[in-house]
Amino acid sequence: MRELSTINYLKKEYKELNLHPLSNIGCTVGLINNDDLFHWRISLLGPKDSVYAGGLYFLNADFDENYPDAPPNIRFITKIYHLNISPIDGEISLSTLCYWVPKTPMKEVLYHIFIL
């Protein structure tokens, strides 16, 4: 039963991000496998007026059956040099993820990653 509620929540979040993308920060979201809502591919443009400007960065977001009560696992798959991103595995050190508040919208999470 828990997995079904997670799937419904992920459907809602995914649909919202695709109907109303974060275009002001150049972010798009897709599924890694067309029939698997638990694994997303995210593309993010580097912020203007930053050392990342002009760059296109890819991230993977993995959700488990406890989402949204548990945070997603989000990692950069594009190599990026940043104090809050592990050069080894792309793990993001972000308070939004470390101190997760259930039902935090993915739009908010992605925005916080963008402004790192």
Question: What are the language-model segments listed below?
Answer:
Residues 1-56, 60-116:
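UBC/E2-like fold recognition across ubiquitin and ubiquitin-like conjugation systems
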